[in-house]
UniProtKB/Swiss-Prot annotation:
Subunit structure: Component of the TFIID basal transcription factor complex, composed of TATA-box-binding protein TBP, and a number of TBP-associated factors (TAFs), including TAF1, TAF2, TAF3, TAF4, TAF5, TAF6, TAF7, TAF8, TAF9, TAF10, TAF11, TAF12 and TAF13. Component of the TATA-binding protein-free TAF complex (TFTC), the PCAF histone acetylase complex and the STAGA transcription coactivator-HAT complex. The PCAF complex consists at least of TADA2L/ADA2, SUPT3H/SPT3, TADA3L/ADA3, TAF5L/PAF65-beta, TAF6L/PAF65-alpha, TAF10/TAFII30, TAF12/TAFII20, TAF9/TAFII31 and TRRAP.
UniProt keyword terms in alphabetical order: Acetylation, Nucleus, Phosphoprotein, Transcription, Transcription regulation
Identification of the protein by name: Transcription initiation factor TFIID subunit 9
Positions of region (Disordered): 150-176, 233-264
UniProt modified residues of type N6-acetyllysine: K5
Compositionally biased residues, Acidic residues: 248-264
Compositionally biased intervals (Polar residues): 151-176
Gene expressing this chain: Taf9
Function statement: The TFIID basal transcription factor complex plays a major role in the initiation of RNA polymerase II (Pol II)-dependent transcription. TFIID recognizes and binds promoters with or without a TATA box via its subunit TBP, a TATA-box-binding protein, and promotes assembly of the pre-initiation complex (PIC). The TFIID complex consists of TBP and TBP-associated factors (TAFs), including TAF1, TAF2, TAF3, TAF4, TAF5, TAF6, TAF7, TAF8, TAF9, TAF10, TAF11, TAF12 and TAF13.
A Pfam family hit: TFIID-31kDa
Amino acid sequence: MESGKMASPKSMPKDAQMMAQILKDMGITEYEPRVINQMLEFAFRYVTTILDDAKIYSSHAKKATVDADDVRLAIQCRADQSFTSPPPRDFLLDIARQRNQTPLPLIKPYSGPRLPPDRYCLTAPNYRLKSLQKKAPAPAGRITVPRLSVGSVSSRPSTPTLGTPTPQTMSVSTKVGTPMSLTGQRFTVQMPASQSPAVKASIPATSTVQNVLINPSLIGSKNILITTNMVSQNTAESANALKRKREDDDDDDDDDDDDDYDNM
């Protein structure tokens, strides 16, 4: 910083000396030499702008020359645009009082960033996790069943009766072993009937063996109870005896009819 005495020698222009005197009157004694140049440029620009506006107002009022009224009007209009002063303190207090009467919005219970609704955000996941477990494809028409081991076969024969079939219950005990697969096959289980003791009926009962077809899809892990109705041979013989009796009765009726016809 240089003093005003050093910045205002006698060799300075008259406008610069006048600006230095203004600064001295304002109590500014220390300043840079370029301050005077900037103040001169501002004064020249401001004065030319005011004079241009005064000419416009004078021509609009149809005056031959620019008078003091035109300059005052130009200064007033330019002051409203270029130099704005802050509003009075009382005016600011009234505005602040009105503004503070408005209640503040309620504070939400949750904290965090204020985000718009989810449909307007990109925070939702737009992907899916792929499962690592691979499902083995089941072969078509293939059934896995446990292996069966046929144990003892027991039968309890009952006393046969003429004219009615004799039901006989056969139970097959199974043991669950290692699983095996059967592809649409059927197997045959032969269940022989045990020799029955002495039968009270006069017609002896004959033992028979029946074949039972078992579907593999119906086999489970539990014991299987197979029930068969075994009809003894005496049922067929009784049916044949009844048939022969009916034929004999028919023959006797025919003979009686012939005798009656001969007598006539």
